[in-house]
Amino acid sequence: MDFLTSELLGVEETLQLTSELTNRESIWLDGRLTAGEHAALVKHNRQLDPSLPLARSIAEIVEQKIIDSPLLKSFALIRRVHSILISRSEVGDGYGWHVDNPFSKHGRRDLSFTLFLSDLSDYEGGELTFQLLQGSKEIRLPAGQIILYPSSSLHCVQPISSGVRLVCVGWIESYIQSTEDRSLLFNLDAGAKGLLARHGRSDELDLIFQAYANAVRRLSGR
């Protein structure tokens, strides 16, 4: 499994985060300031000034929510969450096909995430679109939902045709760099935990958890 979607914020939590982002034009900067040289050519949006206390506060809340999620921790095997940004896209804005830079000054980018902050009824367009071997995959999620995906993915954000799209984006450095290895470990962990919940602990299940822990050690180089 390369992609994962999950609810990260409830309705009230999402409204609380976004309440201070509306009707304040001075807090937004040109989104191209945080893009690489090639990606900047196709990036058209605005981003919350990262130097503002508001931006740092939102980033801290989102980071902690991700770290506290058992599902996201199991899927991403999180070493650190970093480079969190708030993006605002209006009519005509979008982000053409690109691949995220592999590194930032804060760490390696193994997984990217988009946390949707706007209700689906607030805008049209703005689909997060991935180029896959079998074709393209479009994602539009309700407010409070997050998607994690490999940072190596070729993806784009379709132009906004009406309304305003607010999202929080960021990156995860994983203990396990390989997407395939993370997928293997996630399936093993999910299966073992499912058996534990259904049947309780057993000596055989202890061996599976031991194998999982030692596989993480080996694949992480630790």
Swiss-Prot record:
Disulfide bonds: none annotated. It is an enzyme of class 1 (oxidoreductase). Its EC number is 1.14.11.-. GO terms for biological process: DNA damage response; intracellular iron ion homeostasis. Keywords: Dioxygenase, Iron, Metal-binding, Oxidoreductase, Vitamin C. Residues 80-174 form the Fe2OG dioxygenase domain. Fe cation binds at H98, D100, H155. Its cofactor is Fe(2+); L-ascorbate. 2-oxoglutarate binds at R165. This is PKHD-type hydroxylase Syncc9902_2001. PROSITE patterns: FE2OG_OXY. Binds 1 Fe(2+) ion per subunit.
